[in-house]
């Protein structure tokens, strides 16, 4: 009987979740997108994923080795960063540029700030933004699925969203159009999302709130729900909502905070897409959301049961004088 009693100090939290287990679930959830990109764009897509992931793992191992830090390669976080970063690139991206992105993501964004748990933003997200700013022409060199790697598409469905018939909904659902490797196939993203929710790796709050906000605002702005649906299925909205905005370290942990965070990202994405100079604003919206996370947590903090707000000093003095 005594062996069944807990005699340690509180809090008594019993959870079998580990960083490696959670990251392993994310890797599994990313596999449909990886497989879809290989089927749609060919073996070059797999090569880009392998090289980028290997570079992320290598940079993490070398950095920690040189600075005599505990090796964290085994927690799979670098693997997740590598896969997500690769899926945020077009299939024709030169491999050396992918390695540059891996360096920015792992060394600059993650390790220099203290490693996993201390980074200010999602490492893969920062890597994508830096590559987009530094190699814009390469990052926008989209490839049609049925063409060779050097045959470039003129625009993605998001850029062509004015034309309702530029790409059919079925083609968008199956990924039969140009774009970033991991963003084109809606089916693969939804399969990964379903797995993450089923394994309780993430909650639905953030992704659903982001997509719903963009859909509602776009419908109100255009008066066309079909156009809003096209916007939600194109670009990096779905992929970013599921795999990047839900990062444990850089997203809120309170329920209200998650709602504020999702609405904020959806709002910024909508504003950039419709009133900014870029077709896609998801990356910048998530980055701003990451930076705002401490405030979202503070605003969403639940008041303890039985808590009584202290009276202001002046009001308390007046009541004391009346007494």
List where the protein language model places each region.
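Membrane-helix cytosolic exit motif
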Residues: 276-309
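Membrane-interface helix-loop-helix junctions at boundaries between adjacent transmembrane segments
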Residues: 77-78, 83-149
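Structural signature of hydrophobic alpha-helical transmembrane segments
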Residues: 42-55, 92-101, 172, 176-186, ...
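N-terminal signal-anchor module of multipass membrane proteins
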Residues: 1-53, 57, 319-323
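Long hydrophobic alpha-helical segments that form multi-pass transmembrane helix bundles
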Residues: 117-190
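C-terminal ends of transmembrane helices
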Residues: 58-70, 106-117, 189-200, 242-251
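Loop-to-transmembrane alpha-helix initiation sites
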Residues: 120, 124, 229-237, 258-260, ...
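Hydrophobic, membrane-inserted alpha-helices
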Residues: 29-36, 60, 78-86, 102-106, ...
